[in-house]
Amino acid sequence: MSEISNRLQILLIDCYDSYTFNLYDLLYKASENACVIVVHWDKMSPDLWEDILQFDAIVVGPGPGHPAEYSSILNRIWQLNIPVMGICLGFQSLALYHGATIERMPNLPWHGRVSSVTTSKTFIFDGISAVKGMRYHSLYANKIPIDSLQILAQSDEDNIVMSIKATKFPHFGILYHPESVGSSKSLKIFKNFLSLADTPNIQCVNSFSKSANGFSHNLNRYDISPAAFILKSGSPSLQIHSVEIPWVEPLALADCIQKSGNPICFLDSAKKPGRYSILGILTGPLARIIHYEKATNTTEIRICKDNSFVRINNDLWSTVADFMNQHKAIKPDTNLPFYGGIMGIIGYECSDLSTKSVSNASFPLDFQQTTVDAELAFVDRSFVFDLEIKKLFVQTLTPLNETCSEWWGELLASTCNTKLDNLSCLHSFDGKQNFGLVQSFPKKEVYCESVKACQEHLLAGDSYEMCLTDTTFVSAPPELSDFEMYMRARSLNPATFAGFVRLNHFTLLCCSPERFLQFRDDRCLFSPIKGTLKREGHMSLEEARKKLLNEKDMGELNMIIDLIRNDLHQLAKKNSVHVPELYSVEEHSNVYSLLSNIYGRIESPITAWDVLSKSFPPGSMTGAPKLRSVRMLEPLEQHGRGIYSGTLGYWDVTGSAEFNVIIRSAFKYKADDYWRIGAGGAVTILSSPEGEYEEMVLKANSILPAFVNLKNKKRSCK
């Protein structure tokens, strides 16, 4: 046989889980000659069933809910005499098929917690006596029939069956998640499993022609593995002009420019380790504003210089990908993060996962529209501040071979007629100035009931973690400008990923400490935060670390680490996703945070935008599995999140990108006379309703003092 015809063909069944592509990666690591296609469990067409015996092995992935929900499809899998591995839900489905009962855990579910597992040292555990297994399950298999199922592994802590094998067929199940970053010896387990399928399926291997990737042409059409938006990269159409000019304080320049009332995007590294601040303005001939209304699936691109526009009946993600493919530039020798390109926000609901939209479908998408689901600017003129070495660069994008005028000199002369380092907006906020009022704050009893509702979903196996949020509505003192309100918030809560953004339909005051995604060259980085501790007294960083490294907070972060690994594995180069350090603790002005860093390599034609779209909304703001969690949260949250829980950042014309998670922030839409402040936390099975409410209050209070005097009991958020 040829090399291609000898490649193992593996079917991976996705049950709409957020860890499926971690299994995808593990399968490729376990067999260099594997070819894996991924299908949704409920999209297995009659044609696929006719081709099913082409596969040398099948893996049934994890998923939410009870396995009985999937029996109409998965029971047919258990009738096949080919190697099959079921993970978590797949394990439960195999056990249920053979007559076991699937019940709720006798004590609490295990979500994001590592268990010690003792094995039989046989079959898939050949050569393995014990493993560490990351457990994400609310249900377990009881009354296992020993005549049809053999027990291969059990947990040491609670004696729960962790692995089984069918006695008559090469069918295996593992209840814990071997694909998790917290599980051990998983590569050996999967190598043992795939050794059963090492000889291609002789029933059909000669019946179908193979394509270059090892699949028959029949099988290729079933694969749901994501691809890049743009498969052929466009040629550069722009050139970059970058000039160093004398240093100006970024806050002072931002204040001068924003006073014109024109759109502005200011990404403010208000705290180390942030090194660069970026100020984008929309006065150039190439400047555009792009906004998206999900309710009508319409994207508008408006030319700033003459206010003309085009409306495109397509989603934001595809439209922006196509736009940026036509607006590319070759990176110069300087090593700056941004030279021009897309800046702005993408709201939480701006994905297919959410059924909601904050845009109003009853109005056409124009300047009268008060809310949009996303709004971005294409910035052709920008300032980049290197805060570490106090250097300022001014950037201009022009069409190829066009010269660049010194537009910044006129701008600075006309707008900055006040001494830049002596502006009132730079003075620290001391809490003695005027305040606004809280218009509405989440009621404790309502929020606590929502926490309990989340936990019922967790007990039922529908989710491992649900990130519940709510919204506070607050007014600002009328005599203060939006930028002055930003300066208040920044003074109280300086953050690495802060920003002030005002576009046609919204204003955002952002004090976020959390990076969502960073993309440099071919390297991608995610930095989720889970676990928040209030700074009190003289608490040291080491003391905070000891308190944050508890079972609940580590469990929350474990779930999101694995979720982000899954998102990256969809597009990253094989074997490139890694987590050098599972847990880190960062110090902020009001709180300590537990976080992790997840890395991966991305190869052309895949872009930062592709990775962003496949990982949006941020997993740290949804829970896991992401789809089921988002849908279950929607009826529990009284208001659409809008900009909160979305992302603010940039995608540069050279391909670089960085986006935050919009938390610790306030925003208002164009027609609003009030501000919205979102806050919440990850509900796990170890949460207490009162504790979750207090965490939500703590996070809201990171931004509320800029608006409200919390020392005045009548105005207190509690």
UniProtKB/Swiss-Prot annotation:
The highest taxon in the source lineage is: Eukaryota
| Any one of the GO BP annotations | folic acid biosynthetic process
Q: What is its EC number?
A: 2.6.1.85
Instruction: Report the catalytic activity.
Output: chorismate + L-glutamine = 4-amino-4-deoxychorismate + L-glutamate
Q: What class of enzyme is it?
A: transferase
Per UniProt, the keywords (alphabetical) are: Cytoplasm, Folate biosynthesis, Glutamine amidotransferase, Multifunctional enzyme, Nucleus, Transferase
Annotated catalytic residues: 88 (nucleophile), 177, 179
| Matches recorded under Gene3D superfamilies | 3.40.50.880, Anthranilate synthase
**Known pathway:** Cofactor biosynthesis; tetrahydrofolate biosynthesis; 4-aminobenzoate from chorismate: step 1/2
> Quick one: signal sequence residues?
none
Q: What is its main location?
A: cytoplasm
Q: Where is this region: PABB component?
A: 266-718
Q: Where in the cell is the protein located?
A: Cytoplasm; Nucleus
The UniProt record lists the Glutamine amidotransferase type-1 domain at 9-203
Q: Which GO terms describe its cellular component?
A: cytoplasm; cytosol; nucleus
Give yes or no: UniProt keyword Membrane. no
Q: Which Pfam families match?
A: Anth_synt_I_N, Chorismate_bind, GATase
Q: From the Swiss-Prot or TrEMBL record, what is one GO molecular function term?
A: 4-amino-4-deoxychorismate synthase activity
Identify its protein family. Answer: In the C-terminal section; belongs to the anthranilate synthase component I family.
Which NCBIfam families does the entry mention? PabB-fungal, trpG_papA
Q: What does this protein do?
A: Catalyzes the biosynthesis of 4-amino-4-deoxychorismate (ADC) from chorismate and glutamine. Required for the synthesis of 4-aminobenzoate (PABA), an important component in tetrahydrofolate biosynthesis.
For this entry, the protein name equals Putative aminodeoxychorismate synthase
Which source organism does the UniProt entry give? Schizosaccharomyces pombe (strain 972 / ATCC 24843) (Fission yeast)
Q: What is the lineage of its organism?
A: Eukaryota, Fungi, Dikarya, Ascomycota, Taphrinomycotina
